UniProtKB/Swiss-Prot annotation:
GO terms for cellular component: cytoplasm. ATP binds at residues 7-14, 33, 124. The active site is at residues 100, 200. One of its GO terms (molecular function) is tRNA-uridine 2-sulfurtransferase activity. It catalyses: S-sulfanyl-L-cysteinyl-[protein] + uridine(34) in tRNA + AH2 + ATP = 2-thiouridine(34) in tRNA + L-cysteinyl-[protein] + A + AMP + diphosphate + H(+). This is tRNA-specific 2-thiouridylase MnmA.
Length: 395
């Protein structure tokens, strides 16, 4: 009998995942990850992990499966929290959920599970795993979940073949309402529980407050750039090569105070991200102000009025070679190659038509239509059909 360790998070999805595996005849073990216990860094006044681990325990008891808690808070601190702080310091905006899956759930946690004699690790993610043969060897596919509203394959966009080989996603074929229905039918305590929000496993994080504990406030100016500014009317140059054109399209505009007017003050450019409109506290504009650029060197924030402001849009983005990740290495591009894909630059964004261009220095993702708020440090994922084949960090 194959043994599966399920990452029981205390939510309804992983609870039902454990039940389904049991029904399929696996020997199931429930393992709860505790990822946070540093009381010196308060992340929010509600620390849900106690309640969550208790719910996970109740689910395990109900299903009659062994249950253990494993404390990964030190690894979480090193691999996720410290990384987040260093990225924010550089003015980038990291995605903790993608990192948590790559570094914790499918790495540290998976190794613990395998050491318990598990054949597989299962989670409550809304995605599916496929298997095909390439050159006589098995190749694993990361496929979108059946529930369009809940597809979570994006969060797993950094997984490797080795990790996928050992993974199971029991609820990927179901919709959220179906999962709740099963939980209600078998009377799981988590049946009505609300979906967890926020930083993978730490509960609700108020980011600026969380960041302030390491990144000190530093007053700076908020500038507004008019949508009709000449900076947006650069002559379309005749480029010598496709690469030159893409580099131009992916480049961030370097704003200076000369092209803008001061409209307010902020407490630190590193707390803000492109596309953000909350937390600026600047009134009196005809339309809402959106952040179009932050500069941590000069501690300046540049904004524009309205969600259609030209400063928000770019047609291409760049990923450096060491931050390109192919879930399907057999599909990886070599220098000079291109491929048509569908891509997204954030969770739950509708997939966008795009072309990947691989050059010696890295990969360009060129979109058919300009994209709003392409953000450094976030992940771009690329897909063919319902398969996620690769991803990279936006540079």
């Amino acid at each position: 009998m194959k043994r599966v360790v399920v990452g029981l998070s205390g939510g309804v999805d992983s609870s039902v995942a454990a039940y389904l595996l049991q029904e399929q005849g696996y020997e199931v073990i429930g393992l709860f990850m505790k990822n946070w216990h540093d009381d010196s860094v308060t992340i929010s006044n509600e620390c849900p992990w106690l309640e969550d681990s208790n719910d996970a325990l109740l689910v395990a008891e109900k299903l009659g499966i062994p249950f253990q808690t494993v404390d990964l808070s030190q690894q979480y601190q090193e691999k996720i929290v410290d990384y987040m702080f260093s990225e924010y310091k550089k003015g980038r905006t990291p995605n903790p959920d993608v990192l948590c899956n790559r570094e914790i759930k499918f790495d540290v946690f998976m190794k613990i599970a395998l050491s318990l004699g598990a054949d597989y690790v299962a989670t409550g993610h809304y995605c599916r795993k496929g298997e095909i043969e390439v050159d006589g060897k098995p190749v694993y596919q990361l496929l979108a979940g059946v529930d369009d509203n809940k597809d979570q394959s994006y969060f797993l966009c950094q997984l490797s073949q080795e990790q996928l080989a050992k993974s199971l996603f029991p609820i990927g074929e179901l919709t959220k309402p179906q999962v709740r229905e099963i939980a209600t039918k078998i009377e799981l305590v988590t049946a009505e529980k609300k979906d967890s929000q926020g930083l993978c496993f730490i509960g609700k994080v108020r980011l600026p407050e969380f960041l302030q504990q390491q990144l000190k406030p530093k007053e700076g100016l908020i500038f507004e750039v008019d949508a009709t500014n000449q900076i947006y009317n650069q002559e379309k140059i005749n480029f010598d090569s496709v690469q030159e054109k893409l580099a131009f399209e992916a480049k961030d505009i370097q704003y200076t105070p000369e092209v803008a007017k001061v409209v307010g003050k902020h407490q630190g450019a590193h707390y803000f991200t492109i596309g953000q409109r909350k937390g600026l506290n600047v009134g009196g504009t005809k339309e809402a102000l959106f952040i179009i650029s932050t500069n941590v060197e000069t501690n300046a924030i540049y904004t524009g009025q309205g969600h259609k402001h030209p400063g928000l849009f770019k047609k291409a983005l760049f990923v450096t070679n060491d931050e390109i990740h192919w879930i399907r290495p057999d599909l990886a591009l070599t220098n000079g190659q291109t491929i048509q894909v569908m891509a997204r630059i954030r969770y739950r964004q509708e997939l966008q038509k795009a072309t990947l261009h691989q050059f010696e220095n890295g990969l360009y993702v060129e979109f058919e239509t300009p994209q709003s708020a392409i953000t450094q440090g976030q992940f771009v994922s690329w897909h063919i059909g319902d398969e996620l084949i690769g991803s990279g960090v936006i540079s």
